[in-house]
UniProtKB/Swiss-Prot annotation:
Cited NCBIfam families: rpsS_bact
DNA-binding keyword on record: no
Family: Belongs to the universal ribosomal protein uS19 family.
GO biological process terms held by the UniProt record: ribosomal small subunit assembly; translation
Molecular function in Gene Ontology: rRNA binding; structural constituent of ribosome
Source species, domain of life: Bacteria
A single cellular component GO annotation: small ribosomal subunit
Keywords for the protein's UniProt record, in alphabetical order: Ribonucleoprotein, Ribosomal protein, RNA-binding, rRNA-binding
Designated name of the protein: Small ribosomal subunit protein uS19
Species of the source: Cupriavidus pinatubonensis (strain JMP 134 / LMG 1197)
PROSITE patterns: RIBOSOMAL_S19
HAMAP family: Ribosomal_uS19
Name of the coding gene: rpsS
Length: 91
């Protein structure tokens, strides 16, 4: 189920403060956050946000197409190494 339209998008308050400071100060340094659940707002466009994936912070450059999505969608948590080789095919 999706979030109710009357509630509006969710974004952590501490992340919004960091974004407002970065926009006001014209700072190009990535904003480090652990808030994967926050929705990307139009104010984030043009900023680089370092989203934590459980091991490290992945830099995500925010574009117009990303508005409305969650930050966690762009920082993958699992690394796919490929399926195991078929033993019958090797013979």
């Amino acid at each position: 189920m999706t979030r109710s339209a009357k509630k509006g998008p969710f974004c952590d308050a501490h992340l919004l403060k960091k974004v407002e400071a970065a926009v006001g100060g014209k700072d190009k340094k990535p904003i480090k956050t652990w808030s994967r659940r926050s929705t990307i707002m139009p104010e984030f466009i043009g900023l680089t946000i370092a989203v934590h994936n459980g091991r490290q912070h992945v830099p995500v450059y925010v574009t117009e197409n990303m508005v409305g999505h969650k930050l966690g969608e762009f920082a993958l948590t699992r690394t796919f190494k490929g399926h195991a080789a078929d033993k019958k095919a090797k013979r």
